[in-house]
Amino acid sequence: MTTVPISNIRNFSIVAHIDHGKSTLADRLIQTTGGLQAREMKEQVLDSMDIERERGITIKAQTVRLNYHAQDGRDYIFNLMDTPGHVDFAYEVSRSLAACEGSLLVVDASQGVEAQTLANVYHALDAGHEIVPVLNKVDLPAAEPEQVRQQIEDVIGIDASEAVMISAKTGLGIDLVLEAIVHRLPPPQGDREAPLKALLVDSWYDVYLGVVVLVRVVDGVMKKGQRIRMMGTNAAYDLERVGFFTPKMTQVDELGPGEIGFITAGIKEVADTRVGDTITDDKKPVTEMLPGFKPAVPVVFCGLFPVDADDFETLRAAMGKLRLNDASFSFEMETSAALGFGFRCGFLGLLHLEIIQERLSREFDLNLIATAPSVIYKMHLTDGTELEIHNPIDMPDVVKIAEIQEPWIEATILTPDEYLGSVLKLCQDRRGTQKELTYVGSRAMVKYNLPLNEVVFDFYDRLKSVSKGYASFDYHLTDYQPADLVKMQILVNAEPVDALSMLVHRTRAEGRGRAMVEKMKELIPPHMFVIPIQAAIGGKIIARETVRALRKDVTAKCYGGDITRKRKLLEKQKEGKKKMRQFGKVDIPQEAFIAALKVDS
């Protein structure tokens, strides 16, 4: 393969809100430049996971290399990175952007700028990208390209007068996009003669090849057989394969500066390849590392337990496998009296949690129960020490706590005008404080400060339902603030059920507790004795429901005769019930757990 001069390489990514057509545009670019034959084309070529295709979202960032013969007669190489649009996977976005010099900003001409569009554009601007706006779906009857163009200028503040008008589905205007990439995006900078310096963009596990590493070469050349060193982990490997994706894996002899491709080097664990690390030559290393990116910090925690206790080892193996491909997912073992053995897992957000849960049940055929999601709280103790806890069970004695702090976020919500009232009410109910409210055409953009604790439960679902699905939402963590939080426990027959204990705000405890005990009452079947179900804060019971006992008619065999005979039998039954209540064990069905955890706050 002839080497293309570095000035003819373009590295770019596609950023957009969920569902604005990034992956479809990527399909068209691949098709137009001949990356795949027509029979190999399927919709969303780059969304390789089943879940991605089903939900129509992109989870893992994907990359592909295209050859393009431009109108000026030159041959260009495009490296396209398709990135996720959802807020939980912003981490995947930031690392794709670090490997590129430019971005195509795709905006749906019928929907306009959404919250995620903003977040991702700011990521791209932070990475120093040149941005080309692209208006997609202009063939829809509801499309308003002129208004959306104005909106891009007003909200994001970039010049959209030369925005490219396309319809990715029908292929309209794709050639204009390709020319815009050539003329409006900058080529990468790099020195072929300098020592090797490459950025580790991503890594995943392949059953045959071991760990496959996605790299962006900055300076120097990567060749087969070369010995490389990872500067962060200080491990050295011999390169076995070097190549790129067209989206199929294609091997080459070397990757030069500005190119994006993959390498394999007999690496066993994905954990050995830190995303954002710098790769260099073992013999001629560079002295300073490339600026990496911040490692992803889990924000939401929850316990995952197998419904069938025998599945525990399968679950452990499955989690290990997912961890191979998803560096932002973390877990540790935990045991619960009610649910047995399981894992405490950390996620980037609720969608991430849902996806992992779904992948576990799908790819590994596991039945799981998830406990209530919680966030990291900081406890300042009276003896001056500070604790971080994400499991309510670990909470120290109340007497020892001087102050509890909880994480807050800044949420940006874009919503059509007519739903603004209900959106504001929802945020108000969740202890939010409004920061600003601006109008962009007929849409309102609200910024709210909210406690993360209130958001992880079901905020996103509620937001979608009060706005009929039109509002979009994006958030980032700001800081920790003191909060009046209490630990609420659910007692069944005077025994605390550890899987249901949670930290709630004092003002919300009673409502939450009442809802949970009512739900439990419906779902716990009657036993031979009375079962009280209580919600308690410390020693104070805040809500109670009772499951009535089943009773056998012991006086059925008495015909007439003396009343004392009946009384004797009834007293005897009463004694037995009392004893039973003391020693009897209550079986809580799995549905009761699941329902209690789903109780709407």
Swiss-Prot record:
Entry GO MF terms: GTP binding; GTPase activity; guanosine tetraphosphate binding; ribosome binding; translation elongation factor activity
Bilayer disposition of the protein: Peripheral membrane protein
Keyword list, A-Z: Cell inner membrane, Cell membrane, GTP-binding, Hydrolase, Membrane, Nucleotide-binding, Protein biosynthesis
Pfam families: EFG_C (PF00679), GTP_EFTU (PF00009), GTP_EFTU_D2 (PF03144), LepA_C (PF06421)
Recorded superkingdom: Bacteria
Subcellular location: Cell inner membrane
A cellular component annotation (GO) from this entry: plasma membrane
Residues that bind GTP: 19-24, 136-139
Function: Required for accurate and efficient protein synthesis under certain stress conditions. May act as a fidelity factor of the translation reaction, by catalyzing a one-codon backward translocation of tRNAs on improperly translocated ribosomes. Back-translocation proceeds from a post-translocation (POST) complex to a pre-translocation (PRE) complex, thus giving elongation factor G a second chance to translocate the tRNAs correctly. Binds to ribosomes in a GTP-dependent manner.
UniProt record similarity statement: Belongs to the TRAFAC class translation factor GTPase superfamily. Classic translation factor GTPase family. LepA subfamily.
Protein name per Swiss-Prot or TrEMBL: Elongation factor 4
Organism: Rhodopseudomonas palustris (strain BisB18)
Taxonomic lineage: Bacteria, Pseudomonadati, Pseudomonadota, Alphaproteobacteria, Hyphomicrobiales
Gene of this entry: lepA
